[in-house]
Amino acid sequence: MNLEALCKEAGLSFYDDELVSENGRKIYRIYVQKEGGVNLDDCARLSEILSPIFDVEPPVNGEYFLEVSSPGLERKLSKIEHFAKSIGELVKITTNEKEKFEAKIIAVDDENITLENLENKEKTTINFNDIKKARTFVEW
């Protein structure tokens, strides 16, 4: 099953997926994006496309709930492609060495992310494999 192609069929682009457990329920979440933003109708349309396919070829073992959603303004960055699509946005990063950064993403290549520190405007380059977790954020 090709989630990216199925999302494209619904006029959306696949962002990420995850399997979580909340209140004893297994939830399979699919995050999608679209130029101009994702609305409820977009999520419902993709869910209608996926449900009969998942009935035949389940994405996870056992009983689960399917959720289709936008990753949101403040979203997790877990793939190098996520960083590349987020150039110009603000990000909070924790490295494997427990260093913390709040910065703007200014460049991304195959394995490195270049950041501009929000306070002193210094530029720092981090190898993608050194990042433990990262999330975009919005200053209000």
UniProtKB/Swiss-Prot annotation:
- Keyword Cytoplasm listed? The answer is yes
Cross-referenced InterPro entries, in alphabetical order? Ribosome_maturation_RimP (IPR003728), RimP_C (IPR028998), RimP_C_sf (IPR036847), RimP_N (IPR028989), RimP_N_sf (IPR035956)
Q: Does the keyword Cytoplasm apply?
A: yes
**Where is it predominantly found?**
cytoplasm
What GO biological process term is on the record, naming one?
ribosomal small subunit assembly
Q: Where in the cell is it found?
A: Cytoplasm
**Keywords from the named record:** Cytoplasm, Ribosome biogenesis
Q: Which GO terms describe its cellular component?
A: cytosol
Q: Name one Pfam family in it.
A: DUF150_C
Family, per entry: Belongs to the RimP family.
The free-text function statement in the UniProt record for this protein reads: Required for maturation of 30S ribosomal subunits.
Q: Which PANTHER family match?
A: RIBOSOME MATURATION FACTOR RIMP
Q: What is this protein called?
A: Ribosome maturation factor RimP
* Classification lineage: Bacteria, Pseudomonadati, Campylobacterota, Epsilonproteobacteria, Campylobacterales
